[in-house]
């Protein structure tokens, strides 16, 4: 991506010959105890770094205990090697694969801090920078180079460094935004063209793809999104290709995001700030992506104190932050940075984006996590975080938690409710254990029932969306183990008359012990179908159908309830119609039901379904036997 003619570069070298000094002379300006900043991730100046290490090997006493600082390195990190402890001390704001061992052995450092705060710490000299070792594009005709794919904290580092050493590389794209530096501000330049580091995350597996499918159901047309690192975010993006008018305000720009920009899925047209612009702070991808962002005015890179500032994020309408975690407990605390006492990654930008998005108008926060680790041997959903684990996200930071087993909405829920919701999306083989541990810790009811094994696994395939004759769009789905609060709201919102018709007797309450019978079921023997709608962004149960199989007669005993405010809107008709379809698929031949004589609407509903009906009156109620035609 050359931005100038080679002859002009020769002119620059002649004009600024003192800046293109021999490498040994350049590195001789580094002194003992200096703090050296290195560009982030794929923006790492590989040749310049190799040259620095060569200088240290030939001049082993040139300087001592220089502190090497960066967010994250993807390239080699020789300065973290134990043999260079005299010369370097590595200090990272994020722990990567090639520095994790050194950090946990105590021969390298990790500084836990919100990424949005690092530029301020640098600007106020709380984190002083003596030398900035960066990589840039070639200078343009006006004498400016671009930081290209790594702006993040690099901008603050060069604004405050005593010495700036830049490797200029024709392969570094010129990216719009806060990326430009005049060569007058650079102390030394090393011209070396080489391919930029590339980042290719693992191809998403089946688990990641299933998580991505669930997350896509939460993302709406017009949302502005932020995603973290790894194969799961890529799986999420592969599932949103049918969305429209998405925006991006993120820390990290990836290949998958760029592909959606190419397709027009991401166009930033609905953003209320930076409209029409994809905003990011750095990029990790392939050369194909680097070419796309080169001199592309639709993409702007800003300092991480802008992209990650919760005060800015909270002003973005429909901001949706999607980040991953290593472990989450039943109270909603999550760690994305450590496995127990072992440092694994870092705070990163997830806390910045999650907290900003919680406050944004229409904002959402989504935490994605695979249900197990260590090849399925341990659950990532636990009663409480492991001892020593850093709490990256607290109990108020997360709206949705998504595993390959479903979606748990925990925002605004009490500890008991969120514990049950999270158990419901844990790996099935760990659910009984989590139930028992949660009981012992008084997180849930002491008498909480549970059905282990296949019999208790949620049959998601039964979910369907239908529109009633009155135009009401309704989700029909099986009951879940965490639906007790929704069932309680349904029953207690019903009139005494409706309750009497449902339970065939007069009653004022439907206590917890009774409600459990509706939500903890053996799906192979009975079915409870809920009819739900969204009211003010909240799922509300407006109707319920229950069917209990009789294997001897090949029928099912059924009962129905519809919230009073939704009666006469076709909810009951759709419930019985769908329950009939499910029963026929199971090979059942009909229904039985008890209906109070006074319950004319229910009787009429059965009659209009076209069943062959036998009626018998007993103690003020019809005993109905209904055969499918």
Where on the chain are the PLM-derived regions?
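Conserved alpha/beta enzyme-core scaffold
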Residues: 1-452
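Long, contiguous binding/interaction regions
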Residues: 457-629
């Amino acid at each position: 991506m050359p931005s100038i003619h080679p002859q002009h570069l020769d002119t620059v070298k002649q004009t600024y010959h003192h800046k293109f000094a021999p490498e040994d002379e350049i590195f001789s300006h580094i002194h003992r105890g200096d703090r050296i900043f290195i560009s982030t991730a794929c923006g790492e100046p590989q040749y310049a770094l190799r040259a620095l290490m060569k200088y240290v090997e030939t001049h082993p006493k040139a300087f001592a205990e220089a502190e090497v600082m960066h967010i994250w390195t993807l390239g080699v990190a020789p300065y973290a090697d134990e043999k260079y402890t005299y010369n370097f001390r590595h200090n990272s704001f994020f722990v990567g694969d090639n520095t994790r061992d050194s950090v946990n052995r105590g021969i390298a450092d990790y500084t836990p801090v919100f990424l949005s705060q690092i530029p301020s710490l640098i600007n106020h000299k709380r984190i002083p920078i003596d030398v900035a070792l960066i990589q840039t594009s070639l200078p343009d005709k006006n004498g400016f180079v671009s930081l290209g794919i790594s702006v993040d904290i690099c901008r603050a580092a060069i604004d405050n460094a005593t010495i700036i050493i830049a490797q200029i590389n024709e392969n570094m794209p010129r990216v719009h935004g806060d990326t430009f530096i005049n060569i007058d501000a650079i102390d030394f330049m090393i011209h070396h063209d080489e391919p930029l580091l590339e980042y290719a995350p693992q191809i998403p597996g089946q688990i990641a793809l299933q998580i991505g499918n669930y997350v896509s159901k939460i993302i709406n047309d017009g949302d502005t999104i932020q995603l973290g690192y790894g194969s799961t975010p890529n799986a999420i993006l592969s599932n949103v290709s049918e969305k429209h008018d998405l925006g991006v305000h993120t820390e990290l720009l990836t290949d998958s995001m760029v592909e959606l920009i190419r397709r027009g899925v991401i166009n930033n047209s609905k953003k209320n700030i930076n409209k029409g612009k994809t905003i990011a702070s750095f990029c990790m991808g392939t050369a194909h992506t680097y070419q796309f962002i080169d001199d592309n005015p639709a993409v702007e890179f800003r300092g991480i104190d802008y992209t990650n500032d919760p005060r800015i994020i909270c002003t973005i309408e429909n901001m949706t932050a999607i980040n991953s975690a290593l472990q989450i407990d039943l109270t909603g605390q999550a760690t994305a940075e450590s496995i127990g006492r072992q440092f694994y990654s870092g705070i990163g930008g997830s806390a910045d984006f999650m907290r900003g998005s919680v406050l944004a108008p229409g904002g959402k926060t989504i935490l994605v996590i695979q249900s197990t680790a260590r090849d399925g041997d341990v659950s990532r959903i636990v009663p409480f975080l492991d001892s020593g684990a850093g709490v990256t996200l607290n109990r108020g930071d997360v709206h949705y938690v998504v595993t390959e087993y479903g979606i748990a909405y925990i925002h605004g829920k009490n500890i008991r409710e969120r514990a049950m919701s999270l158990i419901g999306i844990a790996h099935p083989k760990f659910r009984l254990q989590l139930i028992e541990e949660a009981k012992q810790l008084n997180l849930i009811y002491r008498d909480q029932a549970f059905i282990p094994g296949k019999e208790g696994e949620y049959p998601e395939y039964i979910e369907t969306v239908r529109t009633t004759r009155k135009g009401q769009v309704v989700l029909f789905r099986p009951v879940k183990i965490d639906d007790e609060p929704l069932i309680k709201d349904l029953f207690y919102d019903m009139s005494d008359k409706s309750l009497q018709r449902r339970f065939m007797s007069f009653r004022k309450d439907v206590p917890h012990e009774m409600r459990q019978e509706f939500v903890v079921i053996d799906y192979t023997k009975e079915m409870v179908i809920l009819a739900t709608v969204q009211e003010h962004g909240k799922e509300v149960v407006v109707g319920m159908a229950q069917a209990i199989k009789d294997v001897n007669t090949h029928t099912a005993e059924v009962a129905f309830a519809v919230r009073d405010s939704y009666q006469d809107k076709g909810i009951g008709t759709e419930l019985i119609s769908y329950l009939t379809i499910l029963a026929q698929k199971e090979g059942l031949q009909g229904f039985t039901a008890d209906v109070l004589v006074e319950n004319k609407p229910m009787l009429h509903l059965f009659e209009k379904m076209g069943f062959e009906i036998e009626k018998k009156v007993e103690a003020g109620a019809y005993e109905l036997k209904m055969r499918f035609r």
